[in-house]
Every structure is written in C-alpha cells, then in structure tokens.
Amino acid sequence: MTNSIRLFVGCASLILVLALYGGAAAGPLDPGYPKAFSCSACHGFAGASGADTVPVLAGMQSWYLKKAIQDYASGKRPSPEMESYSKMVLELGVDDVAGYFARQKRQPSPVRLDSAAVERGRAASTQCVVCHGAQGKGDPAKGIPDLTGQPPGYLKNQMLLFKADRRSPGDETLKALKALMRTIPDEAFGDLAAYYSSLR
C-alpha cells in the first residue's frame, strides 16, 4: 500500500467518523477512534468482532497492542495482511490507536465453549500459570499478555504458530514458550484455548 493510499484511507476514515458523530452530544470524540477506524472491518468498531479466529482488542493492555502493531509492521510477526494495516496505523499514530482499544470495555468472546473442554484445559494449564498467572491475566512488567476472554479459535491458532516457530520466528524472548508448546500434543491446544477463553 503506497503512502498516498494510506493517507487517503486515513483521511476518508476521519471524514466518515466526523460525519457520523459530529452532531452527537455524547462528549468529545476519542482521539484514537478515527485512526482506529480502518481496524473495524475485521476487529469491530469497539474491538470485538465476535469471530472465532479474530482477537478481541477491546480492553487489552495498550503496551501489548502497540507491540503487536510494531511487530506486524516490521515483519517480526509474519502476516501480509496485518503488515500493511499496521504500517498504516504506525503512520496515523500507534499510541492513539492502542490507547483507544485499551480504553474500550472488555468484551469477552461470545463463542460457545464446551464445558468438558474447559475443564480439561484447566487441568492442563499448570505450566501456563507460571507466566500467565492463575487467572490468565499475564504480567505487563514481564511483557506477558492477558489471555482471558479471547476467542478459542484465535488462541489455539497462536499456540500452533508458536509450536511451529511461525509466530515471531527467531525471537529469543519467546524461546521458553515455544519449547513448552512443543511438549504439548496438538489435540490439547483446543482444551487450553477453551479454558483461557472462559476466564474473565
């Protein structure tokens, strides 16, 4: 995507948002909303699309969202589609976009979960809690994100990508996580995903 096209998309998004909300009396417009508008096609206007394989952005930590955008834009986290959008977000203002989604009310995934899978995942999560905590909330000080309420399909896909070293390949900070993923059979990832998706 060329710079001129990115600029056009950003300006068009801003014009549309102002047209929709300019006459509203609900308070000042969040400065990040116009810049995050292009994300809404996949992630929803409030950062929660309801799709099983698309992550919930609403209420996620801003530091994590910012890092994810930067990693996608640089190619460190491979995804051709996300790379182009993330580069545009960097130009528009990554702090505003990450802050906007972080300020939205957390909306856990509505995907229906199998209760038996949740319980199996709970039993299998003993090694995960070392880093992500007993409630799955992570540790911002160590760069560990909150897993709770994410769509199970998304969580399962990410675990499989880590196991195959296809997410952030070569990243030494994720070496221990990837080693752990390789000890887990593929069929167990669905259970772990269901468990963490069930947490609030």
Segments from the language model and where they lie:
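The canonical Cys-X-X-Cys-His
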Residues: C39-A46, V97, G121, T126-A134, ...
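Electrostatic cytochrome c docking/interface patches
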Residues: V17-A36, A48-T53, A102-S125, G143
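Axial heme c-ligation environment in periplasmic c-type cytochrome domains
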Residues: G50-V56, Y72-K105, S109-D114, A141-D146, ...
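Conserved small-residue-rich
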Residues: E119-N157
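Stable alpha-helical elements in mature extracytoplasmic
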Residues: K35, T53, Q61, A68, ...
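Bacterial N-terminal signal peptides that target proteins for export
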Residues: M1-A12
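The feature marks the first
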Residues: L29, P34-S74
